[in-house]
Structures are given as C-alpha cells and as structure tokens.
C-alpha cells in the first residue's frame, strides 16, 4: 500500500488515513485532494489482483497500521464496509463516498445491472480498456464537465492503466458483493457520507438510505456540480468536508 503524502507527523500525532479507490481507479482519483490535506499521513490502497471485496479488505488490513481512518470511493466504499465488518476495532473514522451497500438485486433489476457490467467488459476485452472508458466516463461526471478535456483524459488515462483482466476481476467482485446493511447499523465511529449532486451511479437517495442505517444521526454531504468522480471534479469542496470530518 503506497504512501502518498510524506510529512513530519508521527503515528502518535496523526492517525493514518487510508484512501480506497473504486472500480478501475488508482491513486489518480485521490491525487487532486492530496495537496489540500497537507497535514495528513496518507496511504492509498491497491486492490492488486483481488476478485472479491472481502479479499480486497483482507489485503488492506494486511498492509494497514494498527489503527487508521479510511475513506472509500465507489467500489472502495464497499471495501471500506468489509474492512469494518472484519476489524471494527482498528477503524477510527470511516468515509463512504459515491458508493452503495446493497447486494445485487433479485429479478429484473439485478439482471439489468449484470448485463450492463458485462457489456462494458465485452467492450474492454474486444476493443480495449480506453474505448470502454471513453464510453463509461460519459456517465461518470457532471454533465457540465463532459467537455472538460483535461478531466476526461485524466479519468480515461487512469482506467487505461488497468487491464481488461483487472476489470473482469473487479466486476466479478461487485456482482458478488455482500449486503452491508448490518455493517452500517454497527458503525460506532465518526462516519462521513458524501456523493455528487449529479452522480448517476450512486445517487443522493442511496446515500440518505445508508445514513439512515447508521446508529448516529449523520448528514449526507452533496457536492454541487459533481458527479461520480467528485474527488477529481470538485477537490476543494471535498477537501473542506474531509477536514471537518478529520478534525
């Protein structure tokens, strides 16, 4: 698990913050945020060749310090919930961003999700990850940002650093995800719940449903002018919420 923010703060002074990327994402999804969190000891999780969320959680715990804060984006939020399920005593704070908690739905809804994921995988396997990413990203950012060439290229470049095999493994992990409702009801540490105003993948209502399951009353932060990739779209707004949560 690479360290991404070097500073002079010891473990005794600053609890490490582990940032967990989502599907086909890496350090770049968090990079715009890092300069805005200068006093945090930050590590970024790497899912490697894992093909289940539970395995990703075990991998994170194996490389993590004894106590830590963690923030998970998208699939990374689901990994964060599995980390808390496995080792709640090691988690000091948790942030859930642009994510979900329910398993694959039964019936038509589940079949539709599976078909959509398999269609993207087929494109990645037959035409390449970048071609897939170019189509996928159209639903990943706020509509006003679709013409932001720098942003769109940064996202598709990030996707392209992963292979179609990694995409297949991570899609398998998401299609076989556990129901984390029970985990949410047992979270007794400060929890941040956040999504983008225009997130078409993990909308505001889904995050309010998550917040309602938490034992403590929890506000849902909705980042204006952002979609699913809010850390890359509106890093300053995200950082301000993060700093309030961490402090």
Predicted segments with their positions:
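Flexible "cap/lid" loop of the alpha/beta hydrolase fold
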Residues: 85-86, 90-127, 131-134
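Catalytic histidine-centered segment of alpha/beta-hydrolase-like enzymes
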Residues: 226-239
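Conserved alpha/beta-hydrolase catalytic His-Asp/Glu region
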Residues: 108-109, 127-185
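Short alpha-helix in the alpha/beta-hydrolase fold that links the catalytic acid
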Residues: 189, 203-212
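Conserved HGGG/HGGXW glycine-rich cap/lid loop of the alpha/beta-hydrolase fold
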Residues: 2, 7-59, 69, 73
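Short beta-strand/loop motif that positions the catalytic acidic residue
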Residues: 187, 193-195, 199
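Gly/Ala-rich beta-loop-alpha elbow adjacent to hydrolase catalytic centers
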Residues: 72-76, 80
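Acidic beta-to-alpha connecting loop that harbors the catalytic carboxylate
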Residues: 197-200, 225-227
């Amino acid at each position: 698990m690479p360290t991404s923010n070097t500073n002079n703060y010891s473990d005794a002074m600053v609890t490490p913050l582990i940032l967990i990327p989502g599907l086909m994402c890496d350090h770049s999804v968090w990079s715009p945020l890092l300069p805005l969190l200068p006093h945090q000891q930050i590590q970024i999780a790497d899912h490697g060749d894992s093909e289940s969320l539970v395995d990703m959680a075990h991998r994170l715990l194996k490389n993590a310090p004894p106590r830590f804060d963690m923030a998970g984006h998208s699939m990374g939020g689901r990994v964060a919930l599995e980390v808390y399920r496995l080792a709640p005593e090691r988690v000091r704070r948790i942030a859930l961003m642009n994510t979900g908690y329910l398993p694959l739905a039964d019936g038509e809804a589940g079949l539709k999700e599976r078909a959509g994921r398999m269609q993207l995988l087929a494109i990645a396997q037959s035409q390449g990850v970048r071609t897939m990413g170019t189509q996928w990203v159209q639903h990943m950012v706020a509509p006003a940002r679709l013409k932001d060439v720098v942003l769109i290229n940064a996202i598709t470049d990030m996707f392209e650093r992963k292979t179609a095999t990694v995409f297949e493994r991570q899609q398998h992990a998401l299609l076989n995800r556990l129901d984390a409702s029970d985990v949410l009801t047992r979270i007794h540490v400060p929890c941040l719940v956040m999504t983008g105003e225009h997130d078409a993948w993990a909308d505001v209502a889904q995050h309010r449903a998550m917040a309602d399951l938490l034992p403590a009353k929890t506000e849902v932060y909705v980042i204006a002018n952002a979609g699913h990739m809010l850390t890359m779209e509106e890093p300053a707004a995200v950082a301000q919420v993060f700093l309030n949560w961490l402090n």
